[in-house]
Amino acid sequence: MRYVVIMAGGSGTRLWPLSRHGRPKQLLELFEGKSLLRMAYERLVGLVDDEHILVCTGRAYAFDVAEQIPELPAENILGEPEGRDSLNAVAWSAAVVADRDPDGVVAMVTADQIIEPVDEFQRSLNTAFEVAEARPDALVTLGVVPTSPHTGYGYLHRSEAVEGFTDVFRVAEFKEKPHRELAQSYLDSGEYWWNAGMVVWRATTLLGQLDQLLPETAATVREIVASPERIDELFPRLQKISVDYAVMEPASAGRTDAEVLSVGLRIDWKDVGGFLSLAELFTRDEHGNAVDGRTVTLDSSGCVLVNAVGPDHVVATIGLTDALVVATETATLVARLEDSERIRELVALVRTHAGAQYA
């Protein structure tokens, strides 16, 4: 059977103060009253049954997840006791699916992306399922066909086409986020896709890869499934590492018996990682300011202005250029746009000097 796991962990620190530890970005109802999590679920409707959709999130967010997706059975919401990077969410989820269905094929999708059109996404995901079902040793990643030399995404280098499928290729190598000139060369070559961070595989195949690469992790997630009452004891033993570093990159380099393949996603895709990507969804005024909420500007241009307090509050600026201003009821952020990637550092200082309730 086919399963989908929505990965909805993380605190979304780069979107502070909109996103907080107690209310991370995937739960914020910023998009016409819907959250990124709800939108991720709705993209799956008609593709798999609700009984086969799971969400892996932080334990502290499990209640909110259940409220936002009431269609899911309670046992399909997996609450991590602590965040330990993407591999462990993936590995635990795969172990849960394998325990329920040894023949289960599972897609790991993320809850922090905007994807249109949905029917094209479903078509590509269905192809990835078909590939994983037909080729038991396949690790199938989804690659977004790039439309610009984006420097904020990782890339994958595709090689020869896989016979019997359309828009399916072998992956030669994974690439880190490039500088502008290198990203342009990737785009010009036509051989590189953006790494969407979504994969499809047989649950037992992923666990078999971990047996080869990280046997302690494989053994621990199996033990968690066998003895769920011990999760608080066992989960902290898992190594903090991403699934790309732990599995996908070694497999693509031939260090395991798996084949790494990719299915093309020809979609409008935005990974909502920080304010620069979020601003792409906002309305821009005649001065190039991306605005959300009630704002007034004077001699200000190229800014990102967010008023999350409400209609009884106004954010007003004078003489700002390329600035970021985010106002919430309990915290306000003012920064240069070029420093937006440093918000993590700032949040650590806020936690230390102002208190955890503001972080």
Where are the predicted features?
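Short coil/turn connectors at secondary-structure junctions
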Residues: 1-3, 50-51, 73-74, 101-104, ...
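A residue-level structural signature of the nucleotidyltransferase/glycosyltransferase Rossmann-like core
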Residues: 54, 106, 172, 191, ...
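A short acidic, often aromatic-flanked loop/helix-cap motif at beta-alpha or helix-coil junctions
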Residues: 83-88, 148-150, 180-182, 268-270
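Conserved core of the sugar-phosphate nucleotidyltransferase
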Residues: 117-221, 225-233, 259, 336-337
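Conserved N-terminal catalytic core of the sugar/cofactor nucleotidyltransferase
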Residues: 1-7, 13-24, 29-126, 134, ...
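Left-handed beta-helix
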Residues: 203-359
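Residue-level signal for inorganic ion chemistry
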Residues: 37, 93, 112, 156, ...
